[in-house]
């Protein structure tokens, strides 16, 4: 399958979810256990995380035909492959170089890199003869235990954002670099509170001193909608990782039309939003782990 067709299929599915599920479009797929490669034990990321979660399989384990075959497993007859997309990097050949690239090569002898997308067919563990996948434990719950809350609080504290309890609307203030959250008691559940806080925490990663995303868009603008989509996807990823059920924010319904228009008209909008959301999650994991290790030391 060519990458254009693969991206078109993903875009169609997400637009369909936005139309049918509205502001709740992430819940149906983010509630599932995160997809993982059965052989490498690495989690699928970004768009692939979402795309593989759209399927109806019970197992969250996946692999290519070659990977399954390398372990002696066979695909069940009639099984239809799913796919994943990866951005790969290669060095250009010297005879492909032009202009400044050629000048640089003649001076340094270093070949520049180029990026391209590659599509791989994958099969779920449910489609494999004789393979017994570990039972998937859906850890998401509408009620958080004291231990759950302590773990989430520790993760957020290790990330290090400044959080102010004030007002009745949650937001992130990029100029002053703080997160404003209403009093926790004003939320119906702990789940709603932490789902909201993880959304604002994703915004927090965009500060110029961190990932430096464009957060200058005014309310209702296309740039504002882009940043909100990144935060929505990023918080969905974080909720899945922290075992928090994703809750719907009433104010997100107003972004839906902007998101659907943006995704429909710009072929790169969706992949860019998922990529930036994944980078935000990676950043938070990295600094929280680093600070947690400091505390132990």
Predicted regions and their residues:
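N-terminal accessory/interface modules of nucleic-acid-binding and processing proteins
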Residues: 1-297
